[in-house]
């Protein structure tokens, strides 16, 4: 029986309020409106950014369906959709690509103005309404994607068509974690061969930064984490050295400066803590070092630092979705994965049924997982 043009009832993980477990509910998913597509989600990763909403570190409206790193198949399309059709394999994009705003038109930009992750997220579609209801209540969208559900609706500019032969339970990581880390190196920092790099934080995104540094030909890749259990994987993926800040009496930026002579060429903060952001900045060369903020900064916290850190010549950059123009880059990244130009399997430590979403988040919070993928 065709579902086209009809409301679909399906299972979703609803977060009714902060600091509570996800609740598996039956939700109604409305048909896509003009320029929108409805996607049957096949696999979705659990990312630290989702947990930031649970803890309140990332402010979002409630109730909400989280999830933003996924892959699925187009179930139906709304009017005026031209780039996608039912049956297409797709990856939803939390950074859309409208192709018309200044960021999209600039060779230097990728943060499309149509995103819903900037300073005041609405949790709604472009027309100011939601496509999800549960128990008679409107449920908010998350960064234009909402993938912790069997079906979701996204704007046409927020989905990239990919190779239908790609394993969706692997390439879903290209929807966030892998691309964010890998691109921070290749697109944002533009690390050169022979460079020295430091990577703060060895979760899924941090390990993807390590992979990017190796791909760029960095000669030293120093991985920094307080969980030494992550060091073996970091070395497997390209880290040349691994250090634990807890093993030293002096600040970690001093340790790195001593290890490298005058500091690293490039540092990457992939945790989302203001203390490590300033430490990463201080760790890079005082005159030409580049430090990139990759971890999502905590809401309502301000950063203070010695301006001499910048005055001497350092560059401090941010990177959203690895600097990739999403709709253009994601199909190419999937193609590169299919050509074995990089691996994703080492990042996926757990594959769980969707019903075990709360267990997946527990694995993340206790540091026992790198990436858990939920299969719907």
Swiss-Prot record:
Binds 2 Zn(2+) ions per subunit. Its EC number is 1.1.1.1. The modification N-acetylserine is found at residue 2. Keywords: Acetylation, Cytoplasm, Metal-binding, NAD, Oxidoreductase, Zinc. This is Alcohol dehydrogenase 1. The lineage of its organism: Eukaryota, Metazoa, Chordata, Craniata, Vertebrata. The gene is ADH1. One of its GO terms (cellular component) is cytosol. Homodimer.
């Amino acid at each position: 029986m065709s579902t086209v043009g009809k409301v679909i009832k399906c299972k979703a993980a609803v977060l009714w309020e902060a600091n509570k477990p996800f609740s598996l509910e039956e939700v109604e998913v409305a048909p896509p409106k003009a320029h929108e597509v409805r996607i049957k989600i096949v696999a979705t990763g659990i990312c630290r950014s989702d947990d930031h909403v649970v803890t309140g570190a990332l402010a979002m409206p409630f109730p909400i369906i989280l999830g933003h790193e996924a892959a699925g198949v187009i179930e139906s399309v709304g009017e005026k959709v031209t780039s996608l059709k039912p049956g297409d394999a797709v990856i939803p994009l939390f950074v859309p690509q409208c192709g018309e705003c200044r960021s999209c038109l600039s060779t230097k930009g990728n943060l499309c103005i149509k995103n819903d992750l900037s300073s005041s997220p609405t949790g709604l579609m472009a027309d100011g309404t939601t496509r999800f209801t549960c128990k008679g209540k409107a449920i908010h969208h998350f960064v234009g994607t909402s993938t912790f559900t069997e079906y979701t609706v996204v704007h046409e500019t927020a989905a990239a068509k990919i190779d239908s032969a790609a394993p969706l339970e692997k390439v879903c990581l290209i929807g966030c974690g892998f691309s964010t880390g890998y691109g921070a190196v290749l697109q944002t920092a533009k690390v050169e061969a022979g460079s020295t790099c430091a990577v703060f934080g060895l979760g899924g995104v941090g390990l993807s930064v390590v992979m990017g540094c190796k791909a760029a030909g960095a000669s030293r890749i120093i991985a920094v984490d307080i969980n030494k259990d992550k060091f073996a994987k970091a070395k497997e993926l390209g880290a040349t050295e691994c250090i634990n800040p807890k093993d030293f009496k002096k600040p970690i930026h001093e340790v790195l400066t001593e290890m490298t002579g005058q500091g690293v060429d490039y540092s990457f903060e992939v945790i989302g803590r203001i203390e490590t952001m300033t430490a990463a900045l201080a760790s890079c060369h005082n005159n030409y070092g580049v430090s990139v903020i990759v971890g999502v900064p905590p809401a309502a916290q301000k950063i203070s630092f010695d301006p001499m850190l910048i005055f001497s010549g350092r560059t401090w950059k941010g990177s959203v979705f690895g600097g990739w123009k999403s709709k253009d880059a994601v199909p190419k990244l999937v193609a590169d994965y299919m050509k074995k130009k990089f691996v994703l399997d080492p990042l996926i430590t757990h594959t769980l049924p969707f019903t075990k979403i709360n267990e997946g988040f527990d694995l993340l919070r206790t540091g026992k997982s790198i990436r858990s993928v939920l299969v719907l």
